[in-house]
């Protein structure tokens, strides 16, 4: 799956170096959990960074960026919702 481009063209490898969630602090990303079936027939979940371009300067000035705990909590909540769907119930995810 192709990642969306960051707002200023910075490479994803640089943004996520050492910590997948570090982009939260710099770009005010929201996180989305994705369920997919891998080649071993197991369901796995991954996070996808989704840019939130609207209001970027205002948020920077006010210091109202997403925090790491909030991002992780959102990913977990979306993951739990997806795994509760009838089509995924009883599947193994990691």
Question: Predicted segment positions?
Answer:
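Short N-terminal "domain-start" leader segments
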Residues: 1-46
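Mixed-charge, Lys/Arg-enriched low-complexity segments
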Residues: 2-6, 46-94
């Amino acid at each position: 799956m192709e990642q969306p481009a960051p707002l200023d063209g910075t490479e994803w490898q640089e943004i996520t170096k050492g910590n997948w969630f570090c982009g939260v602090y710099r770009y005010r990303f929201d996180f989305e959990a994705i369920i997919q079936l891998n080649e071993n027939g197991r369901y796995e979940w991954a996070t996808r960074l989704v840019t939130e371009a609207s209001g970027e300067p205002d948020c920077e000035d006010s210091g109202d960026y997403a925090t790491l705990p909030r991002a992780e909590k959102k990913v977990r909540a979306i993951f739990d919702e997806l795994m509760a769907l009838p089509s995924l119930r009883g599947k193994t995810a990691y």
